[in-house]
UniProtKB/Swiss-Prot annotation:
Gene Ontology terms for molecular function: metal ion binding; phospho-N-acetylmuramoyl-pentapeptide-transferase activity; UDP-N-acetylmuramoyl-L-alanyl-D-glutamyl-meso-2,6-diaminopimelyl-D-alanyl-D-alanine:undecaprenyl-phosphate transferase activity
Biological role: Catalyzes the initial step of the lipid cycle reactions in the biosynthesis of the cell wall peptidoglycan: transfers peptidoglycan precursor phospho-MurNAc-pentapeptide from UDP-MurNAc-pentapeptide onto the lipid carrier undecaprenyl phosphate, yielding undecaprenyl-pyrophosphoryl-MurNAc-pentapeptide, known as lipid I.
InterPro entries, alphabetized: Glycosyl_transferase_4 (IPR000715), PNAcMuramoyl-5peptid_Trfase (IPR003524), PNAcMuramoyl-5peptid_Trfase_CS (IPR018480)
Gene Ontology BP terms: cell division; cell wall organization; peptidoglycan biosynthetic process; regulation of cell shape
Family: Belongs to the glycosyltransferase 4 family. MraY subfamily.
Pathway(s) annotated for this protein in UniProt: Cell wall biogenesis; peptidoglycan biosynthesis
Protein name per its UniProtKB record: Phospho-N-acetylmuramoyl-pentapeptide-transferase
């Protein structure tokens, strides 16, 4: 919004040229989202408390968590407000990548909000059924996947609908250019061609998988938000490089016109996340809830797809991956042993993984900070793929 205004008035006030610089707008998006979160946080927490949307705590979990019962949840709304305002203020609203990421983020946020609302307001412990939740996630994920298959493959001024119709007329056999290939880290001249169908399938699983992985990680005070901020900031760097014809050529990456604008979104997400951490740090005054976790995970997955860094997301989001695998292995092993021995057995003391470490003697803050450190290391490792190719 401010970019369009600055471009319109630039002839009358040359200092407004500053608003056209991507890095300046990224910094301002961070500050804006951070400021909104810090200022609006107490009001949002009061409103959530008045709505009596207190978090229910599992009685079979760590006993130290029982004191958290009643802490307001659905605080992810605060994050989404910061992201929306900062992105709309400082982003280029003619950029289609901005809008598709916003659509996925807020679409998944609505799913999470409905799930949270049913749990804490209607007192339905199940919330949305797994089938219902995955159905709506799949609807949004598949729409984004089809849209991005033709958005990423061409320049920003080509109509996506025209490309889609060309694919249909080709008998669904039209290929995609090299910039839409699956990029392999550390290999500068080797990529895996996906084709339209491969791109859609991969994108669907990345977006929906990332959303649910972040949601599973959200279980301790401050645990998930800092990894989201770190991974989001790292993806913002990739977006800046891929969107720049100069830097992408120098670093031997395919140039994706318009992708650089995602730096604004990632910066807004980082600022909003840090503001939320102010109130979510131990002992938490508010929890994120599904409304925040599903939305942020979907956002990370979508940005990673646009900048063609799905494998790097898997690396940098190693904590999310480990938490998800711990749940899958725990459930699978329990079912297998129950069928084979007549008694279900556990691989871990409790899943997800962070609860296993708590029950093994780690304090909550130790688990959180150590997971932060691991994520920082993984993000730095992921960023090395920019140069080590």
């Amino acid at each position: 919004m401010l970019l369009a205004l600055a471009q319109w008035l630039q002839g009358d006030a040359s200092f407004l040229r500053l608003f056209t610089y991507l890095t300046f707008r990224a910094v301002m998006a961070t500050i804006t989202a951070l400021g909104i979160g810090l200022v609006c946080g107490p009001w949002v927490i009061r409103k959530l408390t008045q709505m009596k949307v207190g978090q229910a705590v599992r009685k079979d979990g760590p006993q130290t968590h029982l004191v958290k019962s009643g802490t307001p949840t659905m605080g992810g709304v605060l994050i989404l407000i910061g992201i929306a305002v900062a992105t709309l203020l400082w982003g280029d609203l003619t950029n289609r990548f901005i809008w598709i990421v916003m659509l996925v983020t807020f679409g998944f946020g609505v799913i999470g909000w409905v799930d949270d609302y049913r749990k804490v307001v209607h007192k339905d412990p199940r919330g949305m059924s797994s089938r219902e939740k995955y159905f709506w996630q799949s609807v949004i994920g598949l729409f984004a996947a089809v849209y991005l298959a033709f958005s990423v493959s061409e320049a920003n001024n080509v109509r996506v609908f025209d490309l889609f119709m060309a694919w249909v007329r080709s008998g669904l056999s039209m290929g995609l250019p090299a910039r839409a290939d699956l990029m392999l880290p550390f290999l500068k001249s080797i990529s895996y061609p996906l084709g339209v169908w491969g791109f859609i399938v991969l994108t669907y699983f990345v977006i929906v998988g990332a959303s649910n992985a972040v949601n599973l990680t959200d279980g301790l005070d401050g645990l998930v938000i800092m990894p989201v901020v770190l991974v989001g900031a790292s993806l913002g760097v990739f977006a800046y490089v891929m969107g720049s014809a100069v830097y992408s050529k120098y670093l031997l990456f395919p140039h994706i016109p318009g992708a650089g604008e995602l730096l604004i979104f990632c910066s807004a997400m980082g600022g909003a996340g840090l503001a939320f951490l102010w109130y979510n740090t131990h002992p938490a005054q508010v929890f994120m809830g599904d409304v925040g976790a599903l939305a942020l995970g979907g956002a990370l997955g979508t940005v990673a797809v646009i900048v063609r860094q799905e494998i790097v997301l898997f690396i940098m989001g190693g904590i999310f991956v480990a938490e998800t695998l711990s749940v899958m292995l725990q459930v699978s092993w329990f079912k297998y042993t129950k069928k084979r021995y007549g008694e279900g057995r556990r691989l871990l003391k409790m899943a997800p993984l962070h609860h296993h470490f708590e029950l093994s003697g780690w304090k909550e803050t130790q688990v959180v900070v150590r997971f932060w450190i691991i994520t920082l290391m993984l993000c730095l490792f992921g960023l090395t793929t920019l140069k080590l190719r």
